[in-house]
Amino acid sequence: MTLRACLFALLLLPLAATARDCTPRVKDGWIRLLPGGMPMQAGFGRIDNHCPMPVTIVSASSPAYASVELHESKVVDGVNRMRAVPELRIAPDGAAVLQPGGLHLMLMKPKATLKPGSRVVIEFSLKDGRKLLGEFEVRKPVP
């Protein structure tokens, strides 16, 4: 390795340490409570990445649900379609907005009865092995 390459690598070390220590944040998380004990609910909010490196969410889970998946709704040929999203990449200084009609969390088979005002913790697994926790408030659907 040349001296120039060694110096360049040394200059990058603080950036790598900063990126590793930087953690994205979940904001404004909420869950739409559906009537009649439906086995599926949807979660919304925002995940901000103020880090200098991209982050990738590869899965989600919660002790309150049997299963949590990232999904996306899109209109294709005039028909609303929903599909699972295997990974969600968030650019440096970017955000992922989870909202009705777009990216969202599918929360399947609640393990207990949830009521408006309840709080649910959802854990997001990042591609680099780190975990990100977010708190989501259960809300009644807006009529």
Regions found by a protein language model. Name each.
Residues 1-7:
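Bacterial N-terminal signal peptides that target proteins for export
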Residues 10-11:
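Hydrophobic alpha-helical transmembrane segments of integral membrane proteins
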Residues 14-19:
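N-terminal signal peptide c-region/cleavage motif recognized by signal peptidases
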Residues 20-143:
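Compact, glycine-rich, soluble single-domain proteins
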